[in-house]
């Protein structure tokens, strides 16, 4: 299969996987299939976003990295110091993706490192490994193309995360703004009592201590629940179980209290 055919195959496979959720495992599988190599999509912090093993590496330390889906910090830093595509790295190099403690088994191995760049910043690293064959120029073209696509997907996921965070923040602000003064006061006391993201409380006890009616507490909780900020469930005489669903809620509540 020539370069054009491989590029088209890779492009088709990656486009088929395009969705609102970025699946880096699938992307690694697709790259591994076309590149015929072990493939690791590594984040800036060394997290293994996607792994595809074409040629098994029987080594306990490497197996541990794969199970934890995390490269060691020192190796991650070494990857980050590689600022341009570096091909056919030997087993003796500190950048090899193969276990140097089994040097004899992997003496013909080749590692290729491709920085993942997007939006003008380093987003991660694409690491490829083969047991025997060198990576040729066509392989490197494909690898750099693959790294570009992965970079675009990382940026897309970051954008989705930012949108989700902004939406959650807006929902919390709207929910809190819908509360009356007495309801807001009740909510502040409730979550001081809760001391965490979930727990059990007795509304009548809080109402008596703060000097408000139980109905104010019930109405306040109902407003937050209808906005999807919290989940509540009556446990009868035991009280009411409350769980915070929106992780922006406590921050916004604290911000309002401090103003």
UniProtKB/Swiss-Prot annotation:
Stored Pfam families: CodY, HTH_CodY
Keywords attached to this entry: Cytoplasm, DNA-binding, Repressor, Transcription, Transcription regulation
Keyword Transcription regulation carried by entry: yes
Residue ranges of the annotated DNA-binding region, renumbered to this chain: 203-222
Gene3D superfamilies for the chain: 3.30.450.40, Winged helix-like DNA-binding domain superfamily/Winged helix DNA-binding domain
Lineage: superkingdom: Bacteria
Localization, UniProt: Cytoplasm
Gene Ontology terms, MF aspect: DNA binding; DNA-binding transcription factor activity; GTP binding
GO terms for biological process, alphabetical: negative regulation of DNA-templated transcription
GO CC aspect terms: cytoplasm
Main location: cytoplasm
Chain spans, region GAF domain: 1-155
Family membership noted in the UniProt record: Belongs to the CodY family.
Task of the protein: DNA-binding global transcriptional regulator which is involved in the adaptive response to starvation and acts by directly or indirectly controlling the expression of numerous genes in response to nutrient availability. During rapid exponential growth, CodY is highly active and represses genes whose products allow adaptation to nutrient depletion.
Name of the protein in its database record: Global transcriptional regulator CodY
Record gene name: codY
């Amino acid at each position: 299969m020539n370069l054009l055919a491989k590029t088209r195959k890779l492009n088709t496979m990656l486009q088929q996987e395009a969705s609102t959720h970025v699946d880096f495992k699938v992307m690694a599988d697709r790259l591994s299939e076309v590149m015929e190599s072990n493939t690791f999509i590594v984040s800036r912090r060394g997290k293994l976003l996607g792994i595809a093993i074409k040629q098994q590496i029987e080594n306990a330390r490497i197996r541990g990295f794969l199970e934890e889906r995390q490269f060691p910090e020192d190796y991650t830093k070494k990857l980050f110091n590689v600022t341009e595509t570096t091909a056919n790295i030997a087993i003796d190099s500190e950048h090899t993706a193969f276990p140097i403690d089994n040097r004899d088994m992997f003496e013909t191995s080749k590692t290729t490192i491709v920085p993942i760049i997007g939006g003008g910043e380093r987003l991660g690293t694409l690491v490829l490994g083969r047991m025997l064959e060198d990576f040729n120029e066509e392989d490197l073209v494909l690898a750099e193309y693959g790294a570009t696509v992965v970079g675009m997907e990382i940026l897309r996921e970051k954008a989705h995360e930012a949108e989700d965070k902004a939406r959650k923040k807006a929902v919390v602000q709207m929910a809190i703004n819908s509360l009356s003064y007495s309801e807001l006061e009740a909510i502040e006391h409730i979550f001081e009592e809760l001391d965490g993201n979930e727990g059990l409380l007795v509304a009548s006890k809080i109402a008596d201590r703060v000097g408000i009616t139980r109905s104010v507490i019930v109405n306040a909780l109902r407003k937050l629940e209808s906005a999807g900020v919290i989940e509540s469930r009556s446990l009868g005489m035991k009280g009411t179980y409350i769980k915070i669903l929106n992780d922006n809620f406590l921050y916004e509540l604290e911000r309002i209290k401090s103003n």
